[in-house]
Swiss-Prot record:
Subunit structure and binding partners: Homodimer.
Organism of provenance: Nitrosomonas europaea (strain ATCC 19718 / CIP 103999 / KCTC 2705 / NBRC 14298)
A cellular component term, taken from the record's GO annotations: cytosol
NCBIfam families: lysS_bact, PRK00484.1
Record-listed Mg(2+) 1 binding positions: E412, E419
Annotated protein name in UniProt: Lysine--tRNA ligase
Superkingdom classification of source: Bacteria
Reaction(s) catalysed (UniProt annotation): tRNA(Lys) + L-lysine + ATP = L-lysyl-tRNA(Lys) + AMP + diphosphate
Annotated compartments: Cytoplasm
Family: Belongs to the class-II aminoacyl-tRNA synthetase family.
This protein's encoding gene: lysS
Keywords tagged on the record: Aminoacyl-tRNA synthetase, ATP-binding, Cytoplasm, Ligase, Magnesium, Metal-binding, Nucleotide-binding, Protein biosynthesis
Length: 502
């Protein structure tokens, strides 16, 4: 008995590719090398669910005939009979190919098939002596000839970067990767259902903006040839969604891509997926409650539990999320600071400079506190916590607090040491918004590349009247990281941005 595992051990890969191309040439000479007339009627997972519990005798008596298709991952040739395992979108199933049932000609052809080839198989279900559900093949079809050998031993790609560059190979060989992206799809579907059930309307807004807005970030710039004008890939859909609220669409949401021309890290990808949703006649406190409910419901639908293990630490989303100001969070995790120090501009400036942080001379106390929070505390926030009362100077689109105009009715949600969501009561005073845009424009002129542009059309929309509104953005990729226990954002984006290969 001989056993073929993965090619590429004893021969150079180029020789293997040449050998497979030779087989493809022979196939072309005999007819259609890439047929498209085979139709399966079952998936591996469904067959296992239906028939794994059946005995050998039950299967033999019922003579269940099925048609399956998938990529061949294992192949074992033994004289007058052979075994193979194929993988489809749902799982794997074993094939039994023999002279008696499949025919000598088809069995002989199978001997020359390679791992990675895509097969269609028709036959009768049975169980082997080891009780493995298998298909006794009566007809075998080579649907696609694979010209390149798969990674050795199907242990997946050893090089992490190659997993990202050649995600198709990672998906073929790594069940965990397939699981992550199946969960991602379920998360997005669960979010949609949560919002639609509450009468939110899903909308689509432009991906190319004449003026970048809705966030403080550097945009990607492109050019429209026919209009001879610069356009920006959107950094956020916020200003368009609020235009819709002005127009009477009082509960809207969008799940789509944002683009920011900034750094790449385990938490950042230049192209990422964001949920943004807006509701008229509500405020930021309502949004915090709604967000807690949303995350619990999504976790239950996706995982069946609100208990999450992330990087070997456990949390329970069923517990109430804490709410802390920026200063309270710093003091909780850094008792070496005092409240007086956190309200001392000179102290904050020196503390930040000591940590190598460049201090903006125009920053107020709130901005300096936030910089210290980002540097010292953000990464320590494992349990879900809403950080509230963001300073007005860093919140150009948020409504100022009625009792203290130095802060805004804004929050950010942190889980597992990273920001998951950002929301606030929306600024709907057009004159206040215009003044804040002017401040941002001055900052941009002074060299702040992330400052916002002045958007006159948005101001005009506000002048028609934006009702009291609350809005929020949730980073889908980071939420998927949390619910799949993935350490890097690249693990949850099918094709993350990477440097160009040499």
């Amino acid at each position: 008995m001989t056993q073929e595992e993965i090619s590429g051990i004893s021969q150079d890969e180029n020789n293997l590719i040449a050998e497979r191309r030779s087989k493809l040439t022979a196939l072309r000479q005999t007819g259609n090398a890439f047929p498209n007339d085979y139709r399966r009627d079952n998936l591996a997972r469904i067959l296992h669910e239906k028939y794994d519990s059946c005995s050998r005798e039950e299967l033999e008596s019922s003579q269940v005939t099925v048609k399956v298709a998938g990529r061949m991952l294992f192949k074992r040739v033994m004289g007058k009979a052979s075994f193979a395992t194929i993988q489809d979108m749902s799982g794997r199933i074993q094939l039994y190919i023999s002279n008696d049932h499949t025919g000598e000609t088809a069995h002989e052809a199978f001997r020359h098939y390679d791992l990675g080839d895509i097969l269609g198989a028709e036959g009768v279900l049975f169980k082997t002596r080891t009780d493995e559900l298998s298909l006794r093949v009566t007809q075998l079809h080579l649907l696609t000839k694979s010209l390149r050998p798969l990674p050795e031993k199907f242990h997946g790609l050893a090089d992490q970067e190659q997993k990202y560059r050649r995600r198709y190979l990672d998906l073929i060989t790594n069940e965990d990767t397939r699981r992550v992206f199946a969960i991602r799809s379920k998360i997005i579907q669960a979010i949609r259902e949560f919002l639609v059930d509450r009468d939110y309307l899903e909308v689509e807004t432009p991906m190319m903006h004449s003026i970048p807005g809705g966030a403080t970030a550097r945009p990607f710039v492109t050019h429209h040839n026919a209009l001879d004008m610069s356009l920006y890939l959107r950094i956020a859909p916020e200003l368009y969604l609020k235009r819709l609220v002005v127009g009477g669409m009082e509960k809207v949401f969008e799940i789509n891509r944002n683009f920011r021309n900034e750094g790449i890290s385990t938490r950042h990808n230049p192209e990422f997926t964001m949920l943004e949703f807006y509701e008229a006649y509500q405020d930021h406190n309502y949004l915090m409650d709604l967000t807690e409910s949303m995350l619990r419901e999504v976790a239950l639908k996706v995982s069946g539990t609100t208990r999450i293990v992330y990087q070997q630490r456990e949390m329970d989303l069923a517990q109430p999320f804490a709410r802390l100001t920026i200063a309270q969070a710093i003091l909780k995790y850094h008792p070496e600071y005092s409240d007086a120090q956190l309200n001392d501009r000179d102290f904050l400036t020196k503390a930040l400079q000591a940590k190598g942080v460049t201090v903006n001379p125009d920053s107020g106390i709130g901005g300096l506190q936030l910089a210290l929070f980002d540097e010292t505390t953000e990464h320590l926030l494992f349990e879900p916590v809403f950080i509230v009362d963001y300073p007005a100077e860093v919140s150009p689109l948020a409504r100022c607090n009625d009792a203290n105009p130095e802060i805004t009715d804004r929050f950010e949600l942190y889980i597992a040491g990273r920001e998951i969501a950002n929301g606030f009561s929306e600024l709907n005073d057009p004159e206040d918004q215009a003044n804040r845009f002017l401040e941002q424009a001055r900052a941009k002129e002074a060299g702040d590349l992330e400052a916002m542009h002045y958007d006159a059309d948005y101001i005009q929309a506000l002048e028609y009247g934006l009702p009291p509104t609350a809005g929020e953005g949730i980073g889908i990729d980071r939420l998927v990281m949390l619910l799949t226990d993935s350490p890097s954002i690249r693990d949850v984006i099918l094709f993350p941005q990477l440097r160009k290969e040499d």
